[in-house]
């Protein structure tokens, strides 16, 4: 037949135009088709046959095909068939004019599957009708709907069905879904041919018997046993061959109807027109003795198909010549047609098995026999225990053994029981259960029989055995497709398919397969479901993406930290995140700002938010928190204080952002996503952090940032964060350290990839402040007591910029550089500890620090930013201009809190200072803060400096002014530290209270200050001194206060920092040391002053001397009463209590006095600046190693040339000589601001004077009081440094500091040229160093810079 039908190739070409191209592709290209068991006929033949019979089947009158049929059907029989085709009364194919839609509507069974296209391929599987032949996946399903004779010259594209199926078979699983649909359809199709639509649409309980039990895989479609075919009453579905042998009924047995007809067709017509349609919406079979027992069908077509059982109508005839097969269900016909076409849409679902079958039943048989030993299809007839591997065999069994009436109806399938149970039980259980249920349902068989079980479960849960077959790893998409060729519920998705994985658990599924076969299918499906459930459940527990608990703080917590606060491994990052926050941090993780991980990592993290365990990163890593915005979603984590409260674990987004930013900067990675409010947060959050209760937090405030962007060990005795007790030990997962965890040294966090801020000198409170401050600073390592503090300037600046300032900055919304904000925050905390307003007042000094930083940075920008901060932070605080220098006492108290402020200052270190390398300032912030307090006068100095027009300092105008004042203090004796402060240990800074008072006194003596400033202006300050423009804006009182305040703040022991016993001891030690140094210097002071005055920098020397005299006079004033011209423990310990006025007067009068003022800061011997100091990075590491290197500011200044170097805490070793061991910022720079504009930093850079005998380079020959106020206190928030430093281990290397200031601190404030201009000092510290080693006094330059910047800042703040 095939040979006869084989059309010439031309036919294929002509008949099969591009539409068939796909089909051709499938058929022609898939050699598997033949191999798969296609008819020996070539594809084209088969196709033609399919099309021909298809055409016949679809439309008897091939009118629509006629035009094409001649060409299309190469075989002569094609037209013959068309003409011969007998129109079935009800058959949708009966009328050629009927399109698929019509057929679907008219023939309940025939095309329902097509309509629903549950089995898109099933529709294709119909062979000639292959609506879905081309699997829906191929997109032909709809196209194939054109199978209707009208579909085109092709009639229905048999090729399509064949193609799709063949394609499926040939390609194996590629067409799986179509196949599964096909397979469902096929399984259904044969029985469907009898009751096709009825079985499909209805659950075909009765009709389902007809329907294929076919493979369990064909979930919804094939097997009534499976419940899919509940509606399929036809056992004949068995392979489509076993439709019930209907009696050729011609008499109507409808209730109350006894009509008789001559032909079956008439009977069918009668039933359809009189009874079924008469039933209207009630689709109940009233046929006498109907097993449905009046149970209604869901749809009319189901009833129509059902009635075929009674009438024996088989409208669906095989169109192939010589084949007389007819089926009551179209789907059965389609399945049958596959035998002619060789189409095998049902592919074995077992992995690795490519066998394809024309019907689902065969596939189920194959799968169950070959790939498993299961016999899921159990005969449910009571007393029968037969089991079969496939539904067709079961149907055969039932039909032959139990009789044609023993339809595999619901009673046989045991749908009710099986449905509920099979999904839950293993296939074996299902089998047993299926049997039991079969029995149970057998008892209820009558009702069950008529009952439509398919749609409920079969469609849902019952995949075809193939679809769900245990052997198949997956249901073929087709299998999963609910193809009820029978037309039952085709849309229902079989629960068993993987696509239905979600449904598997829920699906009692296989139970609905009411037959033993169905139960067998259920077993298989249950196996599959079990597997799937395991997969599902396992995934739910294992495979499912689960977010591991992120809250663990432990090592796992590290992972969770990554996950949660990802960027921040709690333990490893200095930042600790609460365990709970980890989970919350999943949300925050989205924020890449905080994460230490790269954004890429963050991305993975985000994707892996599920994966709570992210690689742990050491908190010590500077950039650990780079990616995450905020590790903790916890509001507390976000809240500055809350974050701080929890310790680092609660880093705020800003803090985390900074950490990440630093990390990114360090790693060169992209900057973290800025927080929406990050910039303000920089100041605000930091400030909040600094101001938060964490002031006492374990984090030693700002880690010093080195220009090298690396954490450098302070020379000797420096404690690395990891080295700090518990600092390195704590893992990211470890609980966040509380403020009390002072011992825990935070690892240095890179901020902005600039430099690691080393927590060096900052007080532990500073650390806590830093921690409280959060931000990247919060990540800064906490050095228990860094032997080597960061540069004084850094500390000073940090102190200067206190949380209060930061807060004000936040409040005022100033846009400040991150550095500025950080410093301000740091300082603000210190100032908060001391007096927020003082800080504000001190703000200019902060700016001075900033100026130092600016000196370091060579930017007045920072000063301006600081000014902004100051304005923001302090303008509100009070006396931004005035700086409440008289509040220096408060400042002193404040400096008690200054350590906290230092800590805060340390926190700000992370900001842009990294780039400038001024991060050292944060460490020095306490000193700087002291300077701030002294800086109020310093601000006055700035104001005076503002009067100075030195263009060079214009950038750093405020800082220059500051620096000028400070330089006036520092230049002579000490190298100008970055902050223009000699960074003295916090203890030294404790003495700044008296200078603060002096500042107030300075404020009281504006004229003197003015005079001094005037001299200062005349003195060759660095161009920063020239930047006196700010000074004009700076309140002279501020400048005065600044001058006094600096010394006060530096000197006031109690106020600056919280007086912890250790800190007190340190302060006392420092004070004693400073006093002793000062005493030495006072002893040497006269000649030092003489040297200073006489030595190079004559201009400055004279000016300084004059200033010193003036300053002495000024300091002699009540303002300066606290300053003692001669060093005395009292002076150092309580500068205010010192007879500083007289001493200052003396100092003013004599260079010695000036050099020796409390303002004068002891400096390390004036040896040549160590290279390490010259290079802040290396020197910072070595700072502790050598006095010169001791000054963290040395390195920091190196890192940021503009940075005001803060002298490290003065240690007794510094006492070697006044010149070498101590730098006194006697500062010619007395800022007597009779008027802000007039104030000129008289602080002569006179290295001679500054040297105070060349040894006391740090001293300004200007009034010792003033210098005490400015240089000592303002230049060095030494308290922090002292706090940070281990006083016992720390050697104060003022020379190093000054040297550092020389290069970095002096950058613009006191240019080496200016110092060089001083005959005495070839370098800034030359005077100092001339005594020990001539070194230009960078401190003076920085001081000038600071003063200038302070003046500018004050001006700015005033404008604010």
Curated annotation (Swiss-Prot):
GO terms for biological process: cell differentiation; positive regulation of DNA-templated transcription; positive regulation of transcription by RNA polymerase II; regulation of transcription by RNA polymerase II; smoothened signaling pathway. PROSITE patterns: ZINC_FINGER_C2H2_1, ZINC_FINGER_C2H2_2. GO terms for molecular function: chromatin binding; DNA-binding transcription factor activity, RNA polymerase II-specific; RNA polymerase II cis-regulatory region sequence-specific DNA binding; sequence-specific DNA binding; zinc ion binding. Keywords: Activator, Cytoplasm, Developmental protein, Differentiation, DNA-binding, Metal-binding, Nucleus, Repeat, Transcription, Transcription regulation, Zinc, Zinc-finger. Residues 474-496, 1173-1190 have a biased composition (Polar residues). One of its GO terms (cellular component) is nucleus. InterPro entries: GLI-like, Znf-C2H2_ZIC1-5/GLI1-3-like, Znf_C2H2_sf, Znf_C2H2_type. Residues 198-245, 390-434, 457-500, 718-740, 1120-1213 are annotated as: Disordered. Residues 230-245 have a biased composition (Basic and acidic residues). Its main location: cytoplasm. This is Zinc finger protein GLI1. SUPFAM superfamilies: beta-beta-alpha zinc fingers. The keyword Nucleus applies. Residues 461-473, 1134-1143 have a biased composition (Low complexity). It is found in: Cytoplasm; Nucleus. The keyword rRNA-binding does not apply. PANTHER family: TRANSCRIPTIONAL ACTIVATOR CUBITUS INTERRUPTUS, ZINC FINGER PROTEIN GLI1. A zinc finger (C2H2-type) spans 250-275, 316-340, 346-371, 377-402. Residues 298-306, 360-365, 390-396 are annotated as: Interaction with DNA. Belongs to the GLI C2H2-type zinc-finger protein family. It comes from Xenopus laevis (African clawed frog). Acts as a transcriptional activator. Binds to the DNA consensus sequence 5'-GACCACCCA-3'. May regulate the transcription of specific genes during normal development. Mediates SHH signaling. Plays a role in cell proliferation and differentiation via its role in SHH signaling.
